[in-house]
C-alpha cells in the first residue's frame, strides 16, 4: 500500500535473507531488470548509494543494513515502454539530446539526480511520478538560471516547464531521442509509455 499523508512509512528490521546490496541506482535497476525478465520475485535491495538511497535517507552503512536498526521500506518502481520495448527504473528517467537546447523530459520516482534536487516534493512510495517537461523553446539563459536553483530545490514556475504528478504518462517526441534510466543510456525512442508500479520494491536503509 502506498504511503498516506501523516502515516508512518516502513518498519525496523535487517536486510532479509536473499537481499541484494546495491551501491547505485544502475545496480538496483540491473537487479530489477534481471528478475523481471526471468519472471522471478525481485529481492529486497539494501541501498548503499545512489539517488534513491539519498531520497530515502540512506547512510551507505552496510553494518546498519544487517542490524535491527535498519528500516525496511516499500518503494514504487518506474516502468517504461520505449517504442514498445519494456524497461524499468528505480529513481529517474531522462529523455534529452542536450540539457541546454531542445526538449528535455525528466520523470522522477525519487528526488535527486546527482547533486540536483529535481523533485523536492516527490516521494518514492506515493503512487505517482513527478514529470518535468521542458519545452524546446526555453531560452539558454533561463535554463542556466534553473540549473543554479536545482542544487537547493528552490524551483520557480516557468511557462516553458510543464510539471505533473501522475501515476502514468505518455510522452511523444518528433524524432528518436536518447533515454537514460537511472543514469545509464538505454537507447533512443520516440514514444515513451511510463507508469508507476506501486510497492513493487522492498528497500532497506
Which residue stretches match the model-derived regions?
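Internal helical hairpin/lid segments
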Residues: 102-145, 151
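Exposed beta-strand and adjacent loop surfaces of beta-rich binding modules
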Residues: 75-77, 128, 176-178
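ATP/nucleoside-binding phosphotransfer catalytic cores, i.e., glycine-rich phosphate-binding loops
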Residues: 135-205
Amino acid at each position: 500500500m502506498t504511503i498516506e499523508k501523516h502515516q508512518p512509512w516502513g518498519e525496523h528490521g535487517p536486510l532479509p535473507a536473499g537481499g541484494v546490496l546495491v551501491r547505485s541506482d544502475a545496480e538496483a535497476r540491473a537487479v530489477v531488470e534481471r528478475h523481471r525478465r526471468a519472471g522471478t520475485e525481485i529481492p529486497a535491495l539494501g541501498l548503499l548509494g545512489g539517488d534513491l538511497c539519498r531520497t530515502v535517507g540512506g547512510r551507505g552503512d552496510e553494518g546498519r543494513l544487517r542490524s535491527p536498526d535498519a528500516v525496511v521500506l516499500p518503494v514504487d518502481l518506474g516502468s517504461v515502454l520505449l517504442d514498445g520495448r519494456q524497461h524499468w527504473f528505480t529513481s529517474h528517467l531522462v529523455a534529452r539530446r542536450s540539457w541546454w537546447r531542445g526538449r528535455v523530459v525528466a520523470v522522477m520516482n525519487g528526488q535527486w539526480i546527482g547533486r540536483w534536487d529535481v523533485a523536492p516534493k516527490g516521494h518514492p512510495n506515493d503512487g505517482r511520478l513527478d514529470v518535468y517537461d521542458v519545452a524546446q523553446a526555453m531560452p539558454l539563459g533561463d535554463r542556466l538560471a534553473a540549473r543554479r536553483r536545482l542544487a537547493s530545490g528552490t524551483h520557480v514556475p516557468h511557462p516553458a516547464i510543464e510539471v505533473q504528478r501522475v501515476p502514468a504518462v505518455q510522452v511523444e517526441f518528433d524524432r528518436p531521442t536518447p533515454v537514460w534510466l537511472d543514469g545509464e543510456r538505454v537507447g533512443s525512442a520516440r514514444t515513451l509509455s511510463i507508469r508507476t508500479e506501486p510497492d513493487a520494491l522492498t528497500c532497506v536503509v
